[in-house]
């Protein structure tokens, strides 16, 4: 496969996606409006490669070869040479619609436009372009270099060729692709977020402390991480956004975001990335 990848967004997910593309030997350009965010993301990628060297997973030559495949740009026009564009911006419907309109204008005629959305309709995103058959969902899991799954979501108009190419790319990245239908939250977050939301309700109602809730789920249910620690890792703002998509899209009160989650997000307590969520970092 001779793909050239462009990743839109240099945040937690964007830099992780760029990392695995570079590690697989695929040329990748990470694009963000902020030069500062790009510098920070590149430093994170370098640090993660160094950590892999210390663990004996790769050697210095492999790291250097991977980093030679990575470039950065503040110009969205850099997507013009990409065969696959992977959007990894904030989980905001209107923002993604705007980005896909721009990508459709700037990307090459046959380029696949993929989105890392964790909950938003692929069909609706595709409708903002003139190439709906080339739009697809590639939902990576966090942290991207570690997690093996990619949810693949085809929209109503996504072609078989686009699906096949995306599945092949996922495998080339060393991931396991699993196809999900285009419903709010797909599979992963339709199952995960109600559990996280219920854990937040437990804290709000005084059923248990965050530590108690997480310990019960780790030791009692054999989860590697408790739901509240996981929410902090995902980002409480992202959790809230996904729950709102589920609640609006499926119309069931069981997806109603817990008021305490809304309060934390309003306070700027977003989890690890802000230094405080259900835990202090």
Residue ranges and their predicted role:
Residues 12, 37-40, 51-112, 120:
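Rossmann-like NAD(P)-binding element
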Residues 8, 31, 73, 88, ...:
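Structural motif
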Residues 24, 161-164, 171-182, 201-205, ...:
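NAD(P)-dependent Rossmann-like dehydrogenase/reductase catalytic/cofactor-binding core
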Residues 1-51, 55:
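NAD(P)+-binding Rossmann beta1-loop-alpha1 motif at the extreme N-terminus of oxidoreductases
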